[in-house]
Amino acid sequence: MKEIGGYLELEELAGEEYYKDMYRLNLGRTALLYLCRLRGCKKLLLPYFLCDSVIKSCRHAGIDLEYYHVDSNLTPQVPDSLESGTYLYLVNYYGQLTDETILYYKKKYQHIIVDHTHAFFQRPLPGVDTIYSCRKFFGLPDGAYLSTDASPVLPLHQDLSGSRMEHLLGRYEKDAASYYSTMLDNASSFQQESPKLMSRLTQNLLKGIDYERVIERREINYRRLDKYFGDRNPLPFQMPRGPFTYPFYYPKGIKLRKLTASCKLYLPTYWNNVIQHATAESVEYDYASNILPLPCDQRYNPQDMDAVADRLYAAIKDLERKK
């Protein structure tokens, strides 16, 4: 029986999601597990250059795993053919995997899965299984989209997200540092999550986002950073639509991150597991350690990008002075 009356709850927002016709799930990693169930996939070929949350989830689900390296252009170093039943998992690092490249791998291997965690605004291609993570681009507690033509025959419970909002609301009203440990605890709790339908809360919040404004702001900020760092940045990357971050390579990235944090410029490390386990000579170790994801998202304006440049160059100057 529907409740009527009493105190008011969060309003139903009147906008539209960017992806209205995809499967809505709780997390990117669980979207992958759900897809593997739908496809009957028993084995994945994963990049070494990958966060351990995906790896742990796949192992826990009993999926066999093999790994491949990437070169300095982030090109997968994979065999010419795959074993029967194996799916190639392609990560779109910083939005650099073009549609043409995806279609090349689809034609060559057939069984591919594309991870668009870094490329929310790159639309899926027909017949290509594609996964998106919502919380990497927006202030959300969870949420993922799955594009697939596989039949969703497996029933799922719906997720509940209200208890995961504390660090988001806390940073909005106060600051990031006060809620950093809460954010980590929240992320850690995802390890126990199974595939579920996206929560009503997350779906509702996704309806309240002005996506065209987000794209425009991210691209303006990216270009502003490129004016400061483009000549110094050795990475041959192109700006994707609505970029995730501005990836800036600096050969002492681990030390530089520590210095920038002291002046409240927080540059996350996305692949700590790679730094811990890869060989120091590998591309994976080099990029996980030394690519600095400079923030260019919709929270900021060009003047904020000026501040990013000022703080980063001050930290570089300080670091190079200590040589």
PLM feature spans:
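Short, conserved charged micro-motifs
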Residues: 78-81, 252-259, 300-306
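Active-site C-terminal subdomain of aminotransferase-like
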Residues: 151-201
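Conserved PLP cofactor-binding pocket of PLP-dependent enzymes
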Residues: 170, 237-244, 248-249, 253-291, ...
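Conserved glycine-rich beta-strand-loop-beta hairpin in the small C-terminal domain of fold type I
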Residues: 197-226, 235-249
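Proline-centric
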Residues: 291-303
